[in-house]
Amino acid sequence: MVSKQQTMGFQTEVKQMLHLVVHSLYSNKEIFLRELISNASDALDKLRFLALSNGSLFENDSDLKISIQINEKLQTITISDNGIGLSWEEAVENLGTIAKSGTKEFISQLTGEQAKDSQLIGQFGVGFYSAFIVADKVTVKSRRAGLQPEDGIVWESKGDGEFTIGYEKKSTRGTEITLHLKPENDEFLSDWRIRGIISKYSDHICWPIVMKKLSEEGKESKEFETVNKATALWTLQKSEISEEDYKQLYKHISHDYMDPLTWSHNHVEGKHEYITLLYIPAHAPFDLWQHEAKHGLKLYVKRVFIMDEATQFLPRYLRFVKGIVDASDLPLNISREILQDNKQVESIRAACTKRVLSMLEKMATNDKETYQKFWNEFGLVLKEGPIEDFANKEAIAKLLRFSTTASGSEKQEVSLEEYVSRMKEGQDKIYYITASSYNAAKNSPHLEIFRKKGIEVLLLSDKVDEWLVGYMNEFAGKKLQSISKGKVELGDDETSEQIKEQEKTLEPLIKHIKSVLNERVKDVLLTNRLTDSPACVVADEQDMGLEMQRILQAAGQQVPVSKPIFEINPDHALIKRLHDIQDDNQFELWVTMLFEQAVLAEGGQLDNPADFVNRVNRLLVSS
């Protein structure tokens, strides 16, 4: 008998999610069972964990399992567990809302294309809502462990925007979900069909999944039998686990629909005993860049589930890695706070980090195509590595990929090792340029002398690149050198001597230009880096780079006041023309225009663009 029944509306995001699930995932209907079994498994994990400190939660029933029953007459499938269960408040919160951060942003990414959307929804994890792919009504009966039988609840919805919830006496703890199947989904009333789905997706679940036994004639008996392997897969030796088993376990722990790119499974013995199973996903999760989103590994202690998203076992730049740590020596009552200062955790973290970097190095060496797929998804995150992880800086540096002037493509596919192997004879530096975009970097006037001499330059246009080169200042004994900061020394003594001679000759012109630009520049110098452009702006060796200044200003940060150096090309026709201008106003117009042109060529912004346009127009008229 249901009492105190109420009708409530779903959260807006849930309505959208239900619509998307039903319409985008209908071609892979069977995943509903995987999702509901996965939820039941989580409920059993949580009960066992909480019962460590409160044994009464077992209520004299510690035989934990998941049960699946089919009723052909009523056209229903019931998935039940004797796990932690739900209270009234938890049912409303967990079944009526989506508590995940970034839900709105996620939904805004959906395109209406079924193939793309099903992949996105898969990586978001639809969980309970997948029931509505096959059912036109879902009934949930549940009672949280430790509450009275009278506190049992019954929740029901047709997936049409609202649900009812009320109290109903339930003598046993746990959750029972009954799916009232749509007529076209009667295939799921077949015992063998359900067993096949369990074998395909949920064989690795470490809790027993039981169904009624079948007689030789195919009839149900009253006895139940376990229909999955019911072992903690990661505790087995590699030789006992198939590739398909590894992939299905990954999908279970990650809620991802795609196979992982690779994985590493290790049993460590010695002073500390633990098992790690680490996966590299094939695509980035939708919340990879959301700072509040948690990314971590599942932690078990002696096969007992302790927590999801334990962030202490990998540095943040490896937050895309999914997997399991099962430690034998950590206390069962360990908390997130204790994990922070635990020596064994530090040891496992160091080992996991090296394991992931080793996996990636192996992939980069043996399967360049797959590694490029990885880089396209996670390269930006990996670039955070040298900034965060000094100890592994060299290993990470080998994994980085860049666009260069030699590759001729925006695709980042050149390693630093490849760059070094192609260096010119006598070249002792790795040259790079940072800019706000690939096109800005590729077309920078700073590249002119390097193109002429055939010297390769890294083209860095990701925001993180500015920080990266600040922390990673050399590779393989070669210093990383910005071509837009300080002087460029290319070992050309003849050019250096020529510049010195020209400086003496052009000293009056340089002084005149300085007097015009005055406070806008730190200095005016002759350049040896330009062949085609009249001028460029560079940062002083000791100053913050111009692109870094722009990034910090855009973020609202205070930036130390630093002025650029204005370098002029004495061989360019426009600079030669300055010699002949007698009128001070005309001279000022030309110099200011050349300076502002150089700022724009470097991707900079002008305080007054209208003034620049007027200046150019006046010069065009007077030419």
From Swiss-Prot:
Coiled-coil residues: none
The UniProt record lists the keyword Nucleotide-binding: yes
Annotated Gene Ontology cellular component terms: cytoplasm
Keyword terms of this UniProt record: ATP-binding, Chaperone, Cytoplasm, Nucleotide-binding, Stress response
Annotated region (A), positions in chain: 1-336
Main localization of the protein described in the UniProt heading: cytoplasm
Record's protein name: Chaperone protein HtpG
Upper taxonomic lineage: Bacteria, Pseudomonadati, Pseudomonadota, Gammaproteobacteria, Legionellales
